[in-house]
Structure formats: structure tokens, C-alpha cells
């Protein structure tokens, strides 16, 4: 989602059936300066809810990159999901 010239938002949401805890994400080393991690770890994310982080786009920014989202359930079991984000 574009919010201004060179500035986008990446949305992280819970499409599961239960609350996710300690939600965080990782990006490749070469993309770390692009994605601002201002809200993570997100303490809990209820079903159907989301939050956004700012993505800075500049000359030389990759058209797409991998994001690995991590979270745990109420019992503390950890989960992760890899996705491709395209700009």
C-alpha cells in the first residue's frame, strides 16, 4: 500500500482461527534498512486483526523480497510462514 512518494506500508494480519502472540517478522539482510520495525514484537494479534509497518522504497530497491512472519500460540508453540512481498 503506497502512502507517499517512496513510502509504502506492509500489512501483517492474522487470518488464523486463534490469537497469535509475540508476532514478529524477518527480512533478508539486504532489505533491513527498507522495512521499519517500529511495532514488533506485537504482543498479541487477534483473529482478523492487522498492523502495518513502513517500507521505504528508493532507487535500487528490490521489486520483491521474502518476509518470514513468526508467532506463537497461547501454549507457547512457535510458528512461522514465509511469503514474498512485491512492490
Q: Over which residues does each language-model region extend?
A:
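Amphipathic alpha-helical "stem/stalk" segments
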Residues: 1-87
Amino acid at each position: 500500500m503506497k502512502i507517499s512518494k517512496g513510502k509504502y506500508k506492509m500489512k501483517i494480519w492474522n487470518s488464523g482461527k486463534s490469537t497469535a502472540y509475540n508476532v514478529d517478522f524477518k527480512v533478508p539482510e539486504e532489505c533491513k534498512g527498507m522495512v521499519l520495525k517500529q511495532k514488533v514484537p506485537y504482543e498479541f494479534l487477534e483473529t482478523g486483526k492487522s498492523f502495518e509497518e513502513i517500507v521505504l522504497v528508493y532507487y535500487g530497491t528490490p521489486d520483491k523480497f521474502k518476509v518470514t512472519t513468526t508467532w506463537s500460540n497461547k501454549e507457547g508453540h512457535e510458528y512461522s510462514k514465509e511469503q514474498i512481498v512485491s512492490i
